[in-house]
Amino acid sequence: MQSDKSKALIDSITLSINNLATMTDATVKSALFKDWLRAVSRFHHYSFNNQLLVLLQRPQAERVAGFHTWKSLGRNVKKGAKGIAILAPCVRKQTVEEADILRTGERGSAMRLCGFRVTHVFDIADTEGKPLPELEHRAQAGGDSLLPRLERAAAAMGIVMEYREVTGSKNGWSEGGKVVVNATLSTPAKCGTLAHELAHEYLHWQSNRRDDMTREQRELEAEATSFAVLAHFGVEQPSDRYLASWDATAESITASLHTIRDAVHHILGVMDSECQAETEIEEIAA
């Protein structure tokens, strides 16, 4: 059973998507889309709906967590701080009959989603206590160390990397299992190009979606994904293409936003895993 509070939150999400779809001001539309991408970059572990809810209520939020999670990290929520309302799933055990597994001869029970409840998280600005080393590390990762991390992520995704001097205006391209980046680019430009092409590989080659999409839609998804991946490390690309010229319905926008969110979560997850493995190797060597 859905509560009135959770229904109100879901309605606010639907309204924000509809507003984006019907917006005619290209500049404002692009700015709103980039705001959402920044939210994805900060909260990529959160669901699509909760990312939007955090953005709608606290656009400047940097890192959010529940009251007890902050306490476990050595930080306390400040007195009088206002929480950010998000949705948490309500689950219960279902019977064998409900799961319709009697015919298979199996026994036991499974979990069933029976709705959502409203819970609250707090931004780091609403807390005080021990500093978080992870945020300091993330801030440092935006320099020259970002490119090697992207390269290791490519290898972990099974993608062959090649730097090649390219004539003309192309910065790079993906070939389905291989990415070529213009060797004459600056390090920041290499980062942007590599992140963009990794997005193409994951979104369009590895998923076999490439032939079912227009070139414009493929470029939109790849550019948006790379923007969010780099923004996670404090690097922003100077691009305003995004949704500004994208004529789409609320349904198609929602589908693409879900896809972009999943791609960002996957690529950042690979980068985090590779960074952790690298740290463990350094500790062993020391």
Predicted regions and their residues:
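N-terminal accessory/interface modules of nucleic-acid-binding and processing proteins
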Residues: 1-286
